[in-house]
Amino acid sequence: MAARQIWARTGAALCRQPSAAPPPAPLWVRAGFRQQLSLTLCPANEGNCGGSAPSTPGRPERAARPSVSEELTAAERQIAELHAAACAAGQLNYVDPATGYVVLTQIAHLQRGECCGSACRHCPYGQVNVKDPSKKKQFNSYFYV
C-alpha cells in the first residue's frame, strides 16, 4: 500500500508537464560575460602588461586593440570570427577549418578554472602551466599562434 502511494506521488511529480516559461539565461549572458571575452590577456607575472589600468573594472578598453583586418591574415581572421561566433552562442568548442581539429573556446577554458598546460589557442591564463618553452605560442592580440 505504501509503495503505491510513493509511486503515485513520484510519478505525478516526474510526469508533470513542463512549464511554459523559458529557462533562465546562462550566467555568462546575464553577467555580461560576453563583453569580457574581448580582453587582451597577458601572463599573470606581467601584471597589467605595462599599460594603465582600465578605467572601469571588468571592462576592456576599446582602443587597446586594432581592428581585425589590420593585423591578421585571412586564415587568422577566420579563426577569430569562428571563435567569436562560438563564444557568442555559448559553445565550448568549434572546428578549425584548416585542420578539422576541435578547438576549445575561451568559455571552456574559463570553466576549467586554470591553465591545463597544453598550449591551447584561446588560453585566457597566458599559458602559464606550459612546461616546454618551445611549445609556448605568441599571442596575436586575439589568440595564440
UniProtKB/Swiss-Prot annotation:
Origin species: Homo sapiens
Pfam family, one: DUF5522
Keyword Phosphoprotein listed: yes
Residues carrying Phosphoserine: S67
A cellular component annotation (GO) from this entry: mitochondrion
Coiled coil: none
PANTHER family according to UniProt: 39S RIBOSOMAL PROTEIN L14, MITOCHONDRIAL, SIMILAR TO NOVEL PROTEIN
Expression sites by tissue: Expressed in retina and retinoblastoma.
Claim: Endoplasmic reticulum is one of the keywords in the record: no
This protein's name: Uncharacterized protein C1orf53
